[in-house]
Amino acid sequence: MNNAAKRADCWFGAKNYGRAVYECLRGGLYFTKDDENVNSQPFMRWRDRFLFCAEAVYKAQAETGGIKGHYLNATAGTCEEMIKRAVFARELGVPIVMHDYLNRGIHRKY
């Protein structure tokens, strides 16, 4: 296995989610991805998630010497908001964002 998706609906919170990304990448995976339903939820806001995940990727790369990545879910309710999120990811130096076009704008609660 060389990639993994973590389930965010277990109420991780952004900091712990970033830690899970780091542990996966540090443990040998090449990339991870956000769950399709992760947009911006009360327990994990998108900006915080982006920051902690970017930090995790860079830390894992520095420690392993390998190329690592994480697919950040930039899905939002409007095109303008998605572009805002993608631009923020680019400013963090994150080369990969994903957009769930079938779920766009739908914020599921379990």
From Swiss-Prot:
UniProt keyword annotation of Signal present: no
Main location: mitochondrion
Keywords for the protein's UniProt record, in alphabetical order: Mitochondrion
Keyword Mitochondrion: yes
Family to which the UniProt record says this protein belongs: Belongs to the RuBisCO large chain family.
PANTHER family, per database record: RIBULOSE BISPHOSPHATE CARBOXYLASE, RIBULOSE BISPHOSPHATE CARBOXYLASE LARGE CHAIN
Misc. comment: Seems to correspond to a fragment of a former RuBisCO gene. A stretch of 270 kb of the mitochondrial genome is duplicated within the centromere of chromosome 2 resulting in the duplication of the gene. The expression of the duplicated gene (At2g07732) is not demonstrated.
Name the UniProt record assigns to this protein: Putative uncharacterized mitochondrial protein AtMg00280
Species of origin: Arabidopsis thaliana (Mouse-ear cress)
High-level lineage: Eukaryota, Viridiplantae, Streptophyta, Embryophyta, Tracheophyta
